[in-house]
Amino acid sequence: GSDRLLMEPMSKVMKTPARTWWLLGVTMFLFSLFLWPSPSVALVGAIMIPFAVRAGLSPLAAAMAMNLFGHGFALSYDVVIQGAPAISAAAAGISAADILSQAWPVFWVMGGVTVLAAFLLNRKSMGTAKLSSSGNVVNKQDSGSQGNSRAALALAAAVPLAFLADIVCMLALDLNGGDATSVVSGTAVLLMCFGAVLGFGKQSPEKVTRYLTDGFLFAIRIFAPVIVIGAFFFLGGGGITSILGEGFGDGILNDWAVWLAAHTPLNPYIAAFFQLIIGCLTGLDGSGFSGLPLTGALAHTFGTATFASVPVLAALGQIGAIFVGGGTIVPWGLIPVAAICNVSPIELARKNLPPVLIGLTAAFIAACLMLV
């Protein structure tokens, strides 16, 4: 019954799938700016996904909202932590403040157009019948645990307090990325054990074991194909040096980017186009950040040669690399969001592709207008 108690206040706001989608996305965006998307997925998902399910939002639509607002918009902009702008700026010979202050319209056009396109393209399927199975699970859990009022109240109070303590801890100790994810994940495991003890008493070890088994089985069943597909792309990245030697240090994917850079005409608009393409190519390794030194260096080269804005060119490359690999397009970059929403990462990537392409087109047009 703890999830039912937690849902009560939010149910007054989350009345329709459309409103729920925007509220979930904006919440994910704000958390991702301060904590980065990976820990925010676990933090926001653990609290808000049950609310979204109860409001009628499909798991796939919820995953899209969290992924596009978090791993796309917030991570590519990164105005608070400034990890991505710092890498791009260092390679481009400018400051991170230059990118954020001069190219902010490009970031907002990319993020705004992408999430709006995603909403408009999927608004009719946000509350489909696919949700019924998840909704039934929640309802059964509610009805079976309503008798444990004390346990439900204790757990309902412990969950938000524990995750709030995580936020304070991450901000105080400057934890982000994998470290922050570990803090949130560890808290979730402790809460699961605490809830099992309160709800099932002596049977709690068996329940915890079953929950862990179900989680591992789900991960293996859903993400095993991702490992195989990802292996072929990783062979094209820098990791190929461990197999074929140092002579292949750049990797096949980076070779494509370098070749395109060498054959790009000296025109600000063509340079902007290839900056975007090269950023997307470097993002295919599933990292997003690995291509930022290359796109930053090319922004400096192209900007100097064509008298174009280096921050705008660097922002374009950064947007392409992170939206593709950070990620919203590459399936193995979607694993955290797909896992928390119980959806296929490949299906999520397929749904993300049209709005991201629309957003990239809009960002390119905005950049060209700024280069005039």
What are the residue ranges of the model-derived segments?
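Alpha-helical transmembrane segments of multi-pass membrane proteins
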Residues: 18-32, 57-74, 99-104, 108, ...
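Inter-helical loop and helix-membrane interface segments of multi-pass membrane transporters/permeases
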Residues: 84-98, 131-145, 169-178, 245-259
